[in-house]
């Protein structure tokens, strides 16, 4: 009888330890997955921001070129008006 009680207690202990181990492993896996997703999103946002920044720089350069061209045309018109 004593043997059966001990065996039953060991089975319960084994079951509890197995549940704790499985739960801990699952939690660690979930945390690891969360961190990987968080890093992937951070990298994606950084890539998008860098791409948009590059596009804005290009647009600013194009606008500066257009502004310079317009300034040159205005100066030409002023010179022509001054000559008349």
Swiss-Prot record:
GO terms for cellular component: host cell membrane; membrane. It is found in: Host membrane. Residues 41-84 form a coiled coil. The chain crosses the membrane at residues 13-35. The keyword Transmembrane helix applies. Keywords: Coiled coil, Host membrane, Membrane, Transmembrane, Transmembrane helix. It is a single-pass membrane protein. This is Uncharacterized protein 84.
